[in-house]
Amino acid sequence: SANGPLSTPRMPEVAGMARFQGESFHTAQWDYGVDLKGKSVGIIGTGASAAQVITSIADEVETLTVFQRSATWALPRDDEPTPPAIVDAFKKGGYSESLRFIDWANGPQPNPDLPFTFETLHDAEANAKLCGAIAKRIKADVNDPDLAELLTPDYPFFCKRVLFIDDYYTTFNKPNVRLINDPEGVIGVTETGVE
């Protein structure tokens, strides 16, 4: 289950929220009664929940405006089907010694284009190398160089939660998706939008 220290949503305190005349809700309290198809949607933030929504609704909304205070590191999930040996090991009774060996033997192979090692956690040079490799990927994924620059974090990898999500950066290439980048963040809500 998702119980624990992160199970209670932290609601933002943005001036004027009560004045907004449109539909609004927090991702932690998703309103399934609101149909977003064909609407102009604004998302405040680029954290984990926002990133999931951004990639999920971009194709169905008329316009999507993302309000970003700081960029986020995001990597594709690179999901693959579960190997048959692991499926068989689970069928035999959970996480066994044989399954641990299969995990170790078939674990993720190093990616030469993504130099992640445990040194990136405590070695500034290794972390900078990893950040450079991911920044290069962002520039390759995002068509507009200025937009790619805005989507590239200016802080070390692992300084904040890293997102593992497919198509995050490429979503910003869509003609209906717009990024508003302001280090001060959203300061208030009006009857018709944000400021």
Locate each region found by the language model:
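Short polybasic linear motifs
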Residues: 86-89, 169, 178
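Rossmann-like dinucleotide-binding core of oxidoreductases
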Residues: 2-136, 140
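Short, surface-exposed acidic
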Residues: 140-153
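Generic recognition of flexible, low-complexity loop/linker segments
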Residues: 53-54, 167-168, 191-193
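A conserved short coil-to-beta-strand element within the FAD-binding core of flavoproteins
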Residues: 30-33, 154-156, 176-195
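Anion-binding catalytic surfaces of enzymes that hydrolyze or transfer phosphate/sulfate esters
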Residues: 148, 165, 180
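Short beta-strand to alpha-helix junction loop
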Residues: 121-130, 156-167
